Amino acid sequence: MTSEAAQRVAPPEYQARGEQAVIKTEKLKLETKWDKTYAKSDKVNHQKVTFVNRYGITLAADMFTPKNYTGKLPAIAVCGAFGAVKEQHSGLYAQTMAERGFLTIAFDPSFTGESGGQPRYMTSPDINTEDFSAAVDFLSVQPNVDPEKIGIIGICGWGGLGINAAAMDTRIKASAIMTMYDMSKVTANGYFDYEKDEATLKRERMENRKKLNAQRTADYKNGTYALEGGVPDNLPDEAPDFVKQYYDYYKTGRGYHPRSLNSNHGRNLTSQLTFMNMPQLSYADEIETPVLLVHGEKAHSRYFSEYAFEKMTGVNPHGQSMTVGNKELVIVPGAIHCDLYDGGGKNAIPFDKLEKFFSANLH
């Protein structure tokens, strides 16, 4: 045996013990009553489920199953938006797709909602991408799921994470990305980075790094973590229109939920550092499976989907609906960003298109 080969063999004491990493679940406190921001459907069965990710964090999910189904079902895992919980729009998507014949789960990310993980309110491009793959783990072993027919829906900031997961996890056979944010891009460059030159972007990134690392020191000294991203209770008149749109969803009866980070005090501030340093779309151009991007025509965030589509196809859509190979961009006329959370009172979510997409590609 060569010295190089010997280095690849575990020491005898480890071989003898056959040591393995054992998967253990946390005990979670799960709400038993219906506490969603959307009405309960009588067309599906609902139950709470839990599963564990590769980092040992137990995730909580709502599972929806069509009533009176037979055989194994195609399945879809849903998450988002970034800072939202499953009782908000991801659950609405999951329940609606279950009405249309899919077994679905809407899950809370690590450190969020009813899911486990300490400290609370953390975000991570790695761990949150892993959350999607953990959902696929769970769905793959369900007796009523065909493991070769699993897809995902990522909403808002979980759209970028969904693309990251699809680039990594070949078990994901189709991905729908709704009203997408690329959290790495917006964290590193701020909003509307296409309006800035590279020198400005570099200078702003360095200034932000210095502030965030100073915050790390302060957090450690204080023994607490500063939070950011929650929609304020009192919105200033000069707030941007898209922030007012977030307020209209997260802070009103339309979408408020007591466990939602966006509806309350937000998420860990210094987590921005890892998002700045780890681009989510690095291998988007290597995704071989079908991807459907859906965005509102009037959404401030539309450029994220256009950028992702160009990254995957090499074609700039210039704000138009377009199909290149098995990648499709659908622009919803007149819709703003949050209209694709719950329909915005105008049925903006193209559920017929989603049903057609997943029916065609989870076959």
Per-region residue spans from a language model:
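Short beta-strand/loop motif that positions the catalytic acidic residue
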Residues: I287, L293-H295
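Alpha/beta-hydrolase-fold enzymes
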Residues: N164-K251
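N-terminal cap/lid segment of alpha/beta-hydrolase-fold proteins
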Residues: I23-G71
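Short beta-strand element of the alpha/beta-hydrolase
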Residues: K72-A81
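Catalytic nucleophile-loop/oxyanion-hole region of alpha/beta-hydrolase
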Residues: K86, T112-P147, G344-P350
